[in-house]
Amino acid sequence: MKLVAVADTHGEHCRLTIPDGDVFLHAGDLTERGTLEQLADVAEWMRALPHRHKLVIAGNHDFAFERKPKEARALFHGLTYLEDEEVTLDGVRFYGSPWQPWFHSWAFNVRRGPAIDAVWRKIPAGVDVLITHGPPMGLGDKVWDGERVGCEDLLRHLPRVGAKAHFFGHIHEDRGEWQHGVTRVVNCTTSEGELPATVVEL
């Protein structure tokens, strides 16, 4: 299965040339301000892509998914929006979650420690592909000043989950791929459309 992944398009999705594949996935920050109008534009663009399956989660900029969830989800008809949910496509299990450790006053914030650990405990063991908006600690999480800002609790859950691949964005400065146990860990940020989509063969 060929996966084509992006994150952090921030409304600049039309700048991207999207490769062919079986599954297109967006790991959040579809928009800049998270309005319903901005989400509608992204949804229309995604529906026009030729991929058989299209998955999306929200990011910290995508406020409407948190403030007006019913209206936001309705815009993504014909696409698969995941919010602490699982879907199986062609026998492959995908799980998506938008939450991140508390970050200023953005959307989908959860306090570090027990609160966010409870979020990650919902991820079923044995999913094949995990999609979160933010990174685990120490992998694809280094910001411009060298600080690591990923989630320690998410990192701790990766071995239990045992996914073949974990996609995320959020940190524009640390795009790349790493191996953590059995899991291929991928920061697929496009940094507002400046970087290409990431392609992974599962």
Stretch-by-stretch model annotation:
Residues T31, L36, F103-H104, G126-K164:
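Active-site-proximal segments of metal-dependent phosphoesterases and phosphodiesterases across multiple
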Residues L39-A43, E71-L79, R111-I116, D145-L155:
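Charged helix-capping and loop-helix junction motifs
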Residues M1-H10, A27, G91-Q100, D128-H133, ...:
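Active-site-proximal beta-strand elements of phosphoester/diester hydrolases
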Residues V92-V129, E147-D153:
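Binuclear metal-dependent hydrolase catalytic cores centered on His/Asp/Glu-rich metal-binding motifs
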Residues H10, L30-T31, N60-D62, E86, ...:
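Catalytic metal-binding/acid-base residues of hydrolase active sites
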Residues K2, H53-L55, T80, R93, ...:
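Proline-centered loop/turn at the N-terminus of a beta-strand
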Residues E86-D90, D153-V161, A165, H172-L202:
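Binuclear metal-dependent phosphoesterase catalytic core
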Residues V6-L89, C188:
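Core catalytic region of metal-dependent phosphoesterases/phosphodiesterases
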